[in-house]
Amino acid sequence: MTAGRLLHLLRAPTGTPSAGPVPASAACRGPPHRQLLRFRHGPAGMRRVPVSCTSTTSERKEGMTYKDAGVDIDAGTELVRRIAKMAPGIGGFGGLFPWGDEYLVAGTDGVGTKLKLAFETGIHDTIGVDLVAMSVNDIVTSGAKPLFFLDYYATSKLDVDLAEKVIKGIVDGCTQANCVLLGGETAEMPDFYAEGEYDLSGFAVGAVKKDKVIDGKNIVKGDVLIGLPSSGVHSNGFSLARRVLEKSGLSLSDQLPRNDGITTTVGEALMAPTVIYVKQVLEIISKGGVKGLAHITGGGFTDNIPRVFPSGLGAKIFSDSWEVPPVFKWLQQARINDLLETLMM
């Protein structure tokens, strides 16, 4: 497993062979620098939960946080808490609407300040994949199959060639998610955005039978936690990543070694498109036993994993259970204190 993942929980059948998934509390192979990460869903919190890390290495030194980069996750959580008073149905990864014997499951998202790196690197053909991924990965956590997607593209002055590249990426993302690009909105707003820049939002709708909804309520002690690998940073934490880049003195064109021995540039590593997990997750669901799914995005492990737990349950994860991609190692050199909460770790 690698850092950054969509996590799902399976009930471990009696006599599960050791070659298969192991309980998160079991010993895992890896380097001696082990951290035991504990995540718990308490009765009071919808997202924020206590976290403890026990490490055999020295205590963490003071370092950079997401808030230092201008993003206050606590403020976002407080806004969700307030909105919940007006719209009690929110709080899941996707919103469920009853429709006959099914639920329509909807989600909306953007790609944040990853757009800034797209402008700086000139990589625009995959940002649309990121946009689709952020919404469809949310709705598949309920077991829903994505049906269609809509996009919103806004800019000060429409560059047709640039917009075509972006929308081609959206079409590619929809193909990966096996859904239809049903429509969208192109908004040209003079003087609102900087020249050559644009903003994106996406909206996905899927469906799942009411008796097939995955909501985590049947998770029990002893269930197994499984992670699916990411391609890198995906589409969260880029305000912090850009701050690290600024302070490191590196440029987006500098070389960054990969685990497979091949080198890539820092810009290419950061711009790697978000994995669309729809097909592999639906295939796993079809085999039975999946009780809960979490899409690890903003808030990282600490906020997203407990969202699928019944009150009072938690998870133990050994941090040496996966191979960390080089881009995370590079970011960690900046002594990011809240990596688990910011960058899908």
Put a short name on every predicted segment.
Residues 2-345:
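Helix-biased detector of long, well-ordered alpha-helical tracts
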